[in-house]
Structures are given as structure tokens and as C-alpha cells.
Amino acid sequence: MSADLDARARAILTGNDRGGYTVPTAGLYPFQWNWDSAFAAWGFSTFDADRAWTELETLTAHQWPDGMIPHIVFHRDDEGYFPGPGVWGTGRPTPTSGISQPPVAATMARMILEADRSKAPRAAALVPKLAAWHRWWIRARVREGVVGIVHPWESGRDNAFDWDGGMANVDGSNVGAYQRRDTSHVDASMRPTKAEYDRYLAQVQWGKAHGWDQVKMADEGPFLVADPGTTFILIRACDDLAALAAAAGVADEGAAEMAETLRGGLGTIWNPDGYWDSRDLRTGVFTGILSAGAWLCWLAGAGRPEMDAHLARALGGVRYAMPTVDPTLPAFDARRYWRGPTWPFYNALIALGLRDAGKAAEAERLRVDTADLIRGGGFYEYFDPTDGTPCGGKDFTWTAAIWLAWIRSGAGRDA
């Protein structure tokens, strides 16, 4: 059966290939998404190293002059997705969105290069671009020592509980009429609500009205929430960029120093109740819910004994690790996007950190559970952690990618 799934995973990656870049899945997500693309590269590296590097090169080719790599690149027209390039109005030569997404590309590039050192020249060419992107995060998003996101989509965890407090202060009442496309592809009960979408669009309209001034968006915009997940990913990305540069024989452009600077600011997101937590940087108020971003602390070398206890409780509370919200909380919603479900690609990131922290048994639990979910339900976007029901989009690129690169090949340092 595993051999059949290997072939199916490769077919999904090649089937979602649009010529130099992949889409997350046909229909629901018809463009190039930033962190999806980085995971796609990891998957391609198990059978086509050249194509893996091309994926990352295509992504970084659409970097903005200020260093930002946007969260969506609209390579071609497709009316099946909203909000499209006209709504964003960024004015880029190839249309893009006006925000970014968690910077996992350096981490993927490092693992890809470690598996095949012959591609060092291609890695070397990416280092300055990735370093410029990381510096952009420091300049345009780091406030009070940690990453503050200006839109829930920038976190990649669109409707997580983390953003509810900040979103309550966003006025979505004047966005005008619009037609969502996502709920025509998947069950609406698995997607963000209309009220959430109204506020998402209000934030896009604010950015557009202010010329996508990235610093102004952080300093004056309607929403700024410190995100543990993106902060931990950026710390790890800076560590991995330094290692990538060393392996490729080029300067790391300050990556190691950026990582240490960020580690020094982590106290901002440590909730006194004993866990890493999102925090509204406009009000100083913690979210108060143990959510998915916290599980990436080990990825950044920021594990604490309190988090070990939370991990054990969460693993014991569901059949399939790892729920994106503490399953003991009343707010846990097993099938609604980032309010409870298990995401295979996120499990891979969590497991990478756990393995590096010496938690081999916990990392293996995530690998085995994720494999069981895929064997039982296919290559879906995410799953119900209580019973394994597949949810969201099917034939999903990053789910196929982590099957090949993590579950089957054991690629990377978490093997």
C-alpha cells in the first residue's frame, strides 16, 4: 500500500505543477502560495532535485523591492478564487497579494541541500534573497521583540482563535458585496465564517488604501497580533539560513544574529499562565488559548517544562496528533480549519522541532499518526483529530510532499 501511496503522492505533486510552481490544490487554491510552495519543493526533492530548486526560485523571483516575499503569486487569471489580484491591487508586474506568510523556505532549502550537496550553487543564489526576506520581517513586522502579523492570513492559520481579540476591533461592516469561492469547493462548516471574511477583506482594503506601506500597516493598521508560530518559524529559518549559507560556501548575511535577537524577545509571548501565547500588540492582551503556534516552540529551541506537560495532555486527548487547539478546551472544533483539526504539514514542522529537542517518541507519534490519517483518508488538507475524517481540499500538495519527504523518506534532520 505504501508504494501505491508513494506513486499517488508523486502524481499529486506533478499534477499540481503549473510550470515552475505548484498550486496547493486545483480549484480551491489555484495560485502559488508561499509556504505551500516551500513544502512542495521538499516533496519534489525526493524524486526531482532540479524541480525542487525551481520551485523555490520561482517563489523568490516575485520578491518585492523591500524584501517581502508575498503570500500569493497570481501567475494567471482564475475566477475560482476570491479575493483575486484586482482586490489586492498591489501593482506588481506579476500580481501578488500584499502580505507575506511564515518563512519556511530557508528550512526547506537547508533540508533539500543536505540531501543533495551537488545543488550548492543554486542554494547559494537563494541565500541573499532569503536573507533580505528575513530582514524584511525584522523591519516591517517585529514589534516588542516578536513577529506581529497584520492580517490573520499572514500567519497561515487564517481563522485560529489567536486572532479573535484583534479581529473584534476590525470593522467589517463596510466592505461591500462580494462572492466567496472557497465554500463552493468545500463544506462551509469547515471554513471561516462570513463575519470573519468581512474583517479579512476590511484589512485588505486598508492595506490597499495605504499603498501597501508595510511599516505603516504594522504601526498604524487595524490589526497587529504577536504570533508565536511565525516567530518560532522565523527564528528557525534564520538558524537554517546560516547553515544553508555555510553549506553553500557563502556569507550568511547576518542570519545567525537575527535568530539570537529574536530569541531575546520571546518573553513578550510567554503567558504567565505557563504557555506560549498570541498577544494583541495594540492592547497587550493575551489570547488565553493554547493554540497551534505554541507547538512550534521546539522548532526554535524554545521548549520549556510547562510546554512538555501541555504536549503530553494534548497527545492524550485525541486519537490523531496533533490538534491545532488544546482538545480539552470548550472552544475546540474538530473540523473547522485552524480551530482544532490536525494538519499533516504542520505535524511535520512540530516533529522536526521535537526530534531536535530529543523528544524522539513524541516526534514518532506524530509521524505514525499522520501516516495513518493519509492511509485511511487520502491526501487531504487537514483531518478531524478525533476520528480521522478527511477535511478541506483533496489531492493537496503539501500533504503529498510530507508523505514523501518526512513520512516515507525521513528526509531532513528529524529522521
What is each residue range found by the language model?
Residues S37-D66, G293-G303, N347-A360, R367:
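Alpha-helical support elements that line or immediately flank enzyme active sites
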